[in-house]
């Protein structure tokens, strides 16, 4: 009798549990899926990685003449101002909310070597060569982070939000010379009293920006999408005065004998920018990074 009463008492809970499972199944069925049953839109906990979609679009524009570049391009002067070499990542806190980050590390080194015969060599053939070497280095690091809110139906999603951007760049020039400043080279007529020349030049730039954005994203395959984004940036950028080191062969103390010395000089000017810009083709990542076309993959 007790077992019968217990069974009857549990019937409502069984029906409630079944109804809840059925409701969850219906919600699950309402999610947008591909023909193979794969979810198309991102979910809470997903990670997205994106990059510049311009090369893909340029390839499509040139399909009519695949062996040549017809000159058609998806990029305009203001395209992804300062962000064309930046990785974009997102983490979905919720189905319709994501934190996003940007990271760009760009480095360029250029070296120019000029060769010439050693003027002090007595050789008539196979004359030894000396070289002047000029190096130019440019390093840039860009960090960005923000919050993205999303809404929409089916494959087309809209998004909007804001992000904070930090950038730092360092520029350096160095010079190395085949003919040194010394007494021997002065005696040979290769160096003259009062001569001077640069050894290196250094300058850094710091930038800070606050940017709002709005855009649309279309999922052409499960967890794969193209996005178009437009933004407005409020930014500040400041260059250091820069420092230059020069070497001298002279007689600053009036002793009657030239000697070698180096001296460092501060730059005469310092440049800073503050402003609000929108898709204006600015070369600074802090002033906009406005229009953007991206290809994104969600995992």
What are these regions (language model features)?
Residues 1-24, 295, 299:
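Bacterial Sec-dependent N-terminal signal peptides
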Residues 20-94, 98-102, 106, 112-113, ...:
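Short glycine/proline- and aromatic-enriched beta-strand/turn motifs that initiate or cap beta-hairpins
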Residues 44, 94-96, 151-156, 219-221:
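Outer-membrane beta-barrel channels and translocator barrels
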Residues 58-80, 104-141, 167-207, 235-290:
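Extracellular/periplasm-exposed beta-strand and loop segments of Gram-negative cell-envelope proteins
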């Amino acid at each position: 009798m007790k077992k019968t009463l217990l069974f009857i008492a549990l019937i409502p809970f069984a029906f409630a549990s079944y109804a809840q499972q059925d409701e969850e199944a219906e919600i699950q069925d309402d999610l947008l899926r591909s023909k193979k049953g794969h979810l198309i839109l991102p979910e809470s906990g997903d990670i997205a990685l994106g990059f510049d979609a311009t090369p893909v679009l340029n390839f499509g524009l040139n399909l009519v003449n695949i062996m040549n570049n017809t000159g058609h391009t998806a990029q305009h002067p203001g395209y992804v101002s300062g962000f064309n070499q930046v990785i974009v990542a997102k983490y979905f806190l919720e189905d319709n909310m994501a934190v996003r980050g940007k990271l760009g590390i760009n480095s360029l080194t250029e070296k120019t070597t000029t060769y010439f015969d050693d003027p002090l060599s007595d050789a008539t053939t196979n004359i030894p060569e000396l070289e002047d070497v000029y190096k130019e280095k440019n390093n840039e690091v860009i960090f960005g982070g923000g919050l993205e809110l999303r809404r929409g139906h089916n494959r087309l999603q809209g998004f909007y939000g804001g992000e904070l951007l930090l950038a730092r760049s360092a520029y350096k020039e160095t010079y190395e010379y085949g003919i040194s400043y010394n007494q021997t080279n002065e005696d040979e007529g290769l160096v003259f009293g009062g001569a001077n020349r640069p050894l290196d030049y250094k300058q850094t730039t710091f930038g800070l920006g606050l940017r709002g954005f709005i855009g649309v994203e279309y999922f052409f395959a499960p967890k794969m999408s193209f996005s178009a984004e437009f933004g407005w940036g409020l930014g500040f950028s400041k260059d250091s005065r820069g420092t230059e080191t020069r070497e001298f062969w002279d007689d600053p103390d009036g002793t009657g004998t030239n000697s070698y010395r180096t001296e460092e000089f501060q730059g005469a000017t310092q440049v800073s920018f503050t402003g609000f810009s929108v898709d204006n083709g600015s070369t600074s990542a802090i002033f906009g990074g406005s229009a953007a076309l991206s290809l994104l993959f969600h995992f």
